[in-house]
Amino acid sequence: MNAPKKLPADVAEELATTAQKLVQAGKGILAADESTQTIKKRFDNIKLENTIENRASYRDLLFGTKGLGKFISGAILFEETLFQKNEAGVPMVNLLHNENIIPGIKVDKGLVNIPCTDEEKSTQGLDGLAERCKEYYKAGARFAKWRTVLVIDTAKGKPTDLSNHETAWGLARYASICQQNRLVPIVEPEILADGPHSIEVCAVVTQKVLSCVFKALQENGVLLEGALLKPNMVTAGYECTAKTTTQDVGFLTVRTLRRTVPPALPGVVFLSGGQSEEEASVNLNSINALGPHPWALTFSYGRALQASVLNTWQGKKENVAKAREVLLQRAEANSLATYGKYKGGAGGENAGASLYEKKYVY
């Protein structure tokens, strides 16, 4: 039997230690790795020009928030941000270190169509990844993220077996390359909420996808103790007319994880997937209320941590302090949800606004 080569002991130990820190009790990950194109959409909503200076100001707002490290363990950055400084000349990475927040980096290069499929997607970025990982590590990154996308369409048989295999194998190759270069890989197989499918269909598809992913991780020799999973919660499609409860989401999500995710994995950091800020917190709470679990179940939210922050900031310096208060409020709500102790209501009515975008591109 030809097994993959083992990682050196010191590398394995470093990866496992970092992974555990990222999912430490009461903390989650801030996903701030929007591409330049995606952050333009965010800025357009508040009528702010998408310049490098404005992007730096916004990231400075987020990472310079005093007390953020109480609720946030890591922050995923876009490549520009990893090497960026704020207006005062302080590197963004240093702002994170000041709060004991671990910097991470988005390493995928976006989506392309898989040939011979009905526009199912493959993720680019494996070419040159090892060299980039070395540079990112030197710049202070200690973990990475790679997003894949699948769509449910029962009438068309999506996701196909080919899509499942492509997703799983690409994630496993990425994870292996990251670990060889001392970066903890966050493995993100996102099943989009697009469509009218039921929550039960989402559960079946998610179970199959995660089974494929962990099979591929094993075949590629990925150290599970030094990796994290970033999946969708099990929810109904956005256009589904059947009503579901947060308890349904909690039960089916936990059941799916128990059927597929080995306990060697330190933690699962859920994506918000277009849920409102409040939904993302309440559903995370329902998931953790069903504990104890063999892994930490926490969050890696982008829109569900930032939407109200952006709306409060509006690109104006005089709004920075208030926007930071909003960020802390939302981060604390999700921290409470990791214990199953969130009672709801943080952020008021605005936090209930849908953040769904069809065919979401990050």
Swiss-Prot record:
UniProt-annotated binding residues for D-glyceraldehyde 3-phosphate: 35, 38, 106, 188
The keyword Lyase belongs to this UniProt entry's keyword annotation:
yes
Q: What is its main location?
A: cytoplasm
Q: What does this protein do?
A: Plays a key role in glycolysis by catalyzing the cleavage of fructose 1,6-bisphosphate into dihydroxyacetone phosphate and glyceraldehyde 3-phosphate.
SUPFAM superfamilies recorded: Aldolase
List its EC numbers. 4.1.2.13
Keywords of the record, alphabetical order, are: Actin-binding, Cytoplasm, Glycolysis, Host cell membrane, Host membrane, Lyase, Membrane, Schiff base
Q: Name one Pfam family in it.
A: Glycolytic
Q: Where does beta-D-fructose 1,6-bisphosphate bind?
A: 42, 272-274, 300, 303
A GO BP entry is:
fructose 1,6-bisphosphate metabolic process
Compartmental location: Cytoplasm; Membrane; Host cell membrane
Source organism per UniProt: Plasmodium falciparum (isolate K1 / Thailand)
> Residue numbers for the site described as Necessary for preference for fructose 1,6-bisphosphate over fructose 1-phosphate?
362
Q: Which gene encodes it?
A: FBPA
Q: Provide the membrane topology annotation.
A: Peripheral membrane protein
Q: What is this protein called?
A: Fructose-bisphosphate aldolase
